[in-house]
């Protein structure tokens, strides 16, 4: 069974968690990168993110090549953006219809996941959600502990599948 980690990272949190997961399972990694992204530390990022989410935007992504039929287990990671997964994940899920996959979801949030898991489950109908985990401000609140949790969680997910 082949493993894939697909993630989007805005501030680096999901990147750190993805790297931790990759460190303990044999997985290919696909980092989603929007062609036009407004990276900023100002409050404008909330305006940009809010507009993207509420208008259900699907930003164009940098080209990637991935054949999802080659993977049985897919770990999907996203920051929480206005109570749901980030718009680049929306693009990926709309462009790549998955069925009969084992899916593990990791999110990085500011402690307000609201409908994120529910929205993932709706977008991923026809797949098995193996497990879900949330990391609250992992870089800010202690990245080493978050990485350890991610590693243990990834191992548990693989054990549940096997």
Where are these regions (language model features)?
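A generic structural signal for alpha->beta connector loops
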Residues: 2, 24-26, 100, 126-129
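"Short basic amphipathic alpha-helical interaction patches in structured regions
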Residues: 89-93, 118-121
């Amino acid at each position: 069974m082949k493993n894939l980690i697909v993630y989007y990272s805005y501030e680096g949190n999901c990147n750190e968690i993805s790297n931790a997961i990759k460190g303990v399972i044999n997985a290919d990694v696909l980092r989603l990168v929007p062609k036009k992204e407004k990276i900023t530390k100002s409050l404008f990022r909330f305006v940009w993110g809010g507009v993207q989410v509420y208008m259900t935007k699907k930003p164009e992504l940098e080209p990637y090549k991935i054949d999802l039929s080659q993977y049985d287990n897919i770990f999907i990671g996203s920051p929480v953006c206005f109570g749901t997964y980030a718009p680049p994940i929306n693009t990926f899920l709309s462009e790549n219809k998955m069925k009969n996959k084992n899916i593990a979801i990791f999110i990085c949030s500011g402690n307000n996941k609201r409908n994120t898991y529910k929205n993932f489950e709706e977008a991923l109908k026809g797949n098995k959600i193996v497990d879900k985990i949330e990391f609250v401000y992992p870089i800010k609140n202690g990245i080493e502990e978050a990485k350890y949790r991610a590693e243990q969680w990834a191992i548990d997910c693989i054990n549940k599948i096997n």
